[in-house]
Amino acid sequence: MGYLFTSESVSEGHPDKVADQISDAVLDKLLAYDPSSKVACETLVTTGQVVLAGEVKTKAYVDLQLIAREVIKKIGYTKGEYMFESNSCGVLSAIHEQSPDINRGVERQDPMEQGAGDQGMMFGYATNETENYMPLSLDLAHRILQVLADIRREGKVMTYLRPDAKSQVTIEYDDNGTPVRIDTIVVSTQHDDFIQPEDDSQAAQLKADEEMLSIIRRDVIEILMPRVIASIHHDKVLALFNDKIIYHVNPTGKFVIGGPHGDTGLTGRKIIVDTYGGKGAHGGGAFSGKDPSKVDRSAAYAARHIAKNMVAAGVADEMLVQVSYAIGVARPINIFVDTYGRSHVNMTDGEIARIIDQLFDLRPKAIEERLKLRNPIYQETAAYGHMGREPQVVTKKFFSRYEGDKTVDVELFTWEKLDYVDKIKVAFAL
């Protein structure tokens, strides 16, 4: 007998993701003007208010208020009725300098021996059930919300959409861990109050709410989902869609009050959405707002890079990689591998881990250089997942009244590149 597995995603307009995007926009601006910046930027967003806090060591000077407002505007919070709007919200900064104790403990004369910025364990995971080596349930949950955001921005259909939204996808697997069908899809989307009651009675209000919900449900099934399906080019995934899927659309009913006005948002509160949707494991450290000296971020990217290349090379159908560090120490304490009994090589998981240790330099500075992490590449990671995205080179422009304007070409999602497959095949004689 098989089993059901569920993953969720949240949109760029979800309050926690608004906070993540502001934190990473601050990080990007600082790295653009001073690549050696040490940054730990936390953001809180609530009704009409943004609060920035954290520790920074940098030679750059940036306009934090302007950065926050630009992010909020890009997401789509541009109307006063949202009670959180890019031009009118307050922006308070409580950012201060990084502790010199931490800096002394991490910096080294030889940059390659730079110590880890903190202790902790980080995980990378990959599975061959999708073309991007991600869990299918999470991949679909992200895709639904990305298409929903595209529809909102186009403004041609579903014109009542507001920025805040969530999705959840439940997949049925057989006993061999193969997806066999999509069981349930949940979509909750914030919307305008686009049908007004005929009078002030409770019955009239209920009728208007039910009419709105009926329209939203119809549009999700007849407009959103066909576009989601059209964006999929994998026959095995397309075969999982059928007319027996259970849809829960705005199951609590009316969803007009949302975003930071409906729920306070904080940086780092969607770490499972950011990674593997509950598959694999998570060490607990968030990503957004942290420069790559923080192994919470850089080592998690490195572990994903390893796991993805190992699965793509055919070492296993599924793999979890753990690395751990002590603060101020460059080399990882351990590398752990779990292939879930789905390995294709005649080795124990411990032996696989030892070969990984030989193939990949996991010192923080080596990770930074291999994955080009000292570049302004992070705002793009802060919505719809840090993993499973498409590596690409883009041109980014930064404007500063203090530092002048700057244009840089950067490579996004370098940890998703399959650039170690050939080396791995040689090492494992595949």
Summary of predicted features, one role per range:
Residues A40-T58, I327-R331:
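Short, charge-patterned binding micro-sites
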Residues E12-L31, E129-A149, K290-G314:
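Alpha-helical support elements that line or immediately flank enzyme active sites
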Residues T6, L66, K73-I257, G388, ...:
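Glycine-rich, mobile lid/loop segments that gate access to catalytic sites or pores
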Residues R269-I271, Y276-L320, R331-D338:
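C-terminal catalytic subdomain
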Residues T46, A316-E318, Y325-L430:
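Internal helix-turn-beta structural module
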Residues M1-A40, V45, V421, A427:
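N-terminal, positively charged regions that mediate nucleic acid binding
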Residues A40, V51, L92, M122, ...:
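Structured core elements
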Residues E8-V10, H14-A19, G115-T130, V256-A281, ...:
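Conserved phosphate/anionic-ligand binding catalytic regions in large, soluble enzymes, centered on
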